[in-house]
Regions:
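Short loop-to-helix capping motifs
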Residues: 2, 24-25, 69-70
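Short, surface-exposed loop/turn segments at secondary-structure junctions
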Residues: 4-5, 46
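Solenoid-repeat scaffolds in large eukaryotic assemblies
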Residues: 6-7, 74
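C-terminal all-alpha effector/ligand-binding and dimerization domain
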Residues: 15, 32, 36-102
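Short, charge-rich, low-complexity alpha-helical interaction segments
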Residues: 25-33
Length: 102
């Protein structure tokens, strides 16, 4: 659990760096208002088997695209990361919801 807390902390710092680099104060304000919910969601998503490695690969792809000043590739990498995180979260939630009896 402590390891996952640290992983979520590092992941949050990575995303905060991206929000700051965007220079979009409105985005930063929205994110700060949602911080607690996002931390919970990140923890659930990153705890899903295989998701941590996928997340690190997605972050690497995003950073490489930004470093190369490749806007289209960065947008694509961000979209893929968000879609994968959403799918993982939905799978995780569906596995933990009580099943309806027929």
């Amino acid at each position: 659990n402590n390891d996952m807390d640290k992983i979520v902390e590092v992941d949050t710092a990575f995303h905060d760096m991206l929000y700051t680099a965007s220079r979009n104060e409105r985005l930063r304000s929205i994110i700060n208002n949602l911080r607690e919910q996002m931390t919970t969601i990140r923890g659930r998503s990153m705890s899903y088997p295989g998701r941590l490695v996928e997340t690190m690969d997605e972050h690497r792809n995003l950073v490489e695209a930004i470093a190369a000043h490749d806007v289209e590739r960065a947008q694509y990498a961000a979209r893929i990361h968000l879609e994968n995180a959403e799918h993982t979260l939905m799978r995780s939630l569906s596995e933990h919801l009580p099943q309806k009896k027929a």
